[in-house]
Amino acid sequence: MKKIIALILSALLVCSAASCSGGNSSSKAESKTEAATEQKTEAPTNDPEIQAALDKMAEDYEFEGVVYAVKDGTQVASYAKGKLENGDEITLESPMPVGSVSKQFCAAAVLLLQEQGKLSVDDTLDKYFSEYKNGKKITIKNLLSMRSGIPEMTEEGNENLVSNDKTEKENVDAIKKWVFSQELDHDPDTIFAYANVNYFLLSNIVEQVSGEKYVDFLRKSFFTPLNMNHTGTIGELPSNPDWAKGLDYKKVDTQPGLTNGCGDIISNTHDMTVWINALSSGKAISKDSYKAMTTDYSPETHYGYGMFLDISGGVGHYGSIGIYSAFDYINEEKKFTLFVDSNTLEQPTEINSVVDELLKALMK
């Protein structure tokens, strides 16, 4: 899906530079993404040139899902096509899983706790996992930047590590037991190695430090204050499916607890646009914390804390889980944000293509 996302981004950025500097008075009125913004049911008028570029890209790639682009606080392009698992039409308000885009929320939660003086990214893991033999070697910062050396928990051979027949706690305990028994793949802070296990452990640290369930801390700290009323976690679907009507829990293809911190968020275009603006503007976390998120700790791959940093002049993250693929993007220089989600692009390479092309068009 990366290729598709690239197409979307290139299309939008090219057109925005060419046609949006003066703006469109009819499209400016209703698309500010302040923290107190309420869910809108009527979409503002899109910029004709940018919308045309997006529509062409979507047609060429037979893209199904949602795209939402905002420049200078104004919606400039939107797209919604396809069906949810229950047959309902996909709309801009349809919540869908965002996969690894979830890592931004986990990184922000850790940094917020640091702002509150409750932890430090320089803490070593033995402070939180006394049973971990390598705990003294690895810091929270190593987890955030994917430089811990901890082997991936979902590697081949671990298919029976977790199960839908087990509770979330049982699965979490099983994963931790396995992780803490393994040797490191490499010394900490020597190599970037993308692994979900890093953010899985971070979510557990958030729970320990806050004294709350991870999702409860996210809701209290981010979702509720930012009026992200269509955002929650995969684990909430079986007991509270109404807020994400149309989603099939089985299509997410995960077991309770497995995605904690690393791929557990479900959201929609409005909430994700609010989120990425709040994240970069100092509303969700401090400016200093956001700077830490977007600092390059791995020049070979350009990764910060839950953010890839070298995407057409901006930052963002790709996500893929089950049948869903997503992408969010922030370009502070051009004051442009983008969110893409699909329930038909099962391979990450597909959404990458969409984003690459859309960004090219927007950047012209």
Whereabouts are the PLM-identified features?
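Positively charged n-region of N-terminal signal peptides that target proteins for export
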Residues: 1-4, 8
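Short active-site loop at a secondary-structure junction
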Residues: 64, 86-143, 186-195, 260-263, ...
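Short, surface-exposed loop or secondary-structure junction motifs
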Residues: 138-322, 326-327
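C-terminal motif of bacterial Sec signal peptides marking the signal peptidase cleavage site
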Residues: 16-19
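Catalytic loop of the DD-peptidase/beta-lactamase superfamily, centered on the K-T-G motif
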Residues: 22-24, 28, 36, 40-80, ...
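Hydrophobic (often cysteine-bearing) scaffold residues that line and stabilize catalytic clefts
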Residues: 46, 50, 98, 102, ...
